[in-house]
Amino acid sequence: MFVRNTASVVRGTSRNYATLREIETRLKSIKNIEKITKTMKIVASTRLSKAERAKNSAKEYALADAAFYKNAETVPLEDAEKKDLIIAITSDKGLCGSIHSQLAKAVRLQLKQTPNADVVAIGDKVKGQLLRTNSDNLKFAFNGVGKEAPTFEETSLIANKILEGGASNYKKVSIFWNDPISSLSFEPSNKPVFNAAAIEQSPSFSKFEIDADNNVSQDLFEFTLSNEILAAMAEGYAAEVSARRNAMDNASKNAGDMINSYSILYNRTRQAVITNELVDIITGASSLD
């Protein structure tokens, strides 16, 4: 009887020690994750000011373009035989909440209205999501973006590739991007980019003093495309960095809560193990008497 009880005590103690080791391992893992998320939050906070400067700088050119087309009364062309082109802008990086999936959702909603539209994906995140649901619409994609604030040189190269792909042949070109509403929120937005034909047919285009140049409307389209992509990428980058900072802040808080819970559980389990061992020692001593 005594031998059987001893074996039971050993098994019970082993289980308690195993549970303690599991809790301790889990606790160390969560603490390491908390260190990573706190570091990523600091990095995102540092990059946010640079992203805001890039956004404000790029936005000035976009506002100048918008004022020109407003004064020219430019509108997209209506041509049933031609397709629309959607330029969807995200980045290659994740760990920033639902910012990429929200943009992909907005693009999918647009594709329900214009199912024959072509899509150019800028960034691996939107490309990956659209490949799963709308692979037939995806014309081509760019990656290696979103690591730093965009530059005009970078967006000019992207715009040139899109133009080489026949952007001038579409009746309407639209850019979809994440617009930072505040430091805590964003929303997917879209804006048109008017092609050369739409510019030439603007009711008030003739009011502007323009040198005799047959390619001026095409030059305007190409320059505007680069500007609008730059502004959208800069705003999207600022929204992403802000979203990543918020996501890492929430992750750090959640990790802190889990650390507190597991610390309490560890201490209670350790206390229970010590109590059980004392009971076993006292019981064993009583049996010997």
Swiss-Prot record:
GO molecular function, a single term: proton-transporting ATP synthase activity, rotational mechanism
Membrane spanning stretches: none
Pfam families in UniProt: ATP-synt
InterPro entries: ATP_synth_F1_ATPase_gsu (IPR035968), ATP_synth_F1_gsu (IPR000131), ATP_synth_F1_gsu_CS (IPR023632)
Gene3D superfamilies in the record: 3.40.1380.10, ATP synthase, gamma subunit, helix hairpin domain (1.10.287.80)
GO CC annotations, alphabetized: mitochondrial inner membrane; proton-transporting ATP synthase complex
Presence of the UniProt keyword Secreted in the record: no
Subcellular location: Mitochondrion; Mitochondrion inner membrane
SUPFAM superfamilies: ATP synthase (F1-ATPase), gamma subunit (SSF52943)
Alphabetically ordered keywords of this record: ATP synthesis, CF(1), Hydrogen ion transport, Ion transport, Membrane, Mitochondrion, Mitochondrion inner membrane, Transit peptide, Transport
Record CDD domains: F1-ATPase_gamma (cd12151)
Membrane topology: Peripheral membrane protein
Subunit (UniProt): F-type ATPases have 2 components, CF(1) - the catalytic core - and CF(0) - the membrane proton channel. CF(1) has five subunits: alpha(3), beta(3), gamma(1), delta(1), epsilon(1). CF(0) has three main subunits: a, b and c.
Protein purpose: Mitochondrial membrane ATP synthase (F(1)F(0) ATP synthase or Complex V) produces ATP from ADP in the presence of a proton gradient across the membrane which is generated by electron transport complexes of the respiratory chain. F-type ATPases consist of two structural domains, F(1) - containing the extramembraneous catalytic core, and F(0) - containing the membrane proton channel, linked together by a central stalk and a peripheral stalk. During catalysis, ATP synthesis in the catalytic domain of F(1) is coupled via a rotary mechanism of the central stalk subunits to proton translocation.
Family: Belongs to the ATPase gamma chain family.
Name used for this protein in its record: ATP synthase subunit gamma, mitochondrial
Species name: Kluyveromyces lactis (strain ATCC 8585 / CBS 2359 / DSM 70799 / NBRC 1267 / NRRL Y-1140 / WM37) (Yeast)
Phylogenetic classification of the source organism: Eukaryota, Fungi, Dikarya, Ascomycota, Saccharomycotina
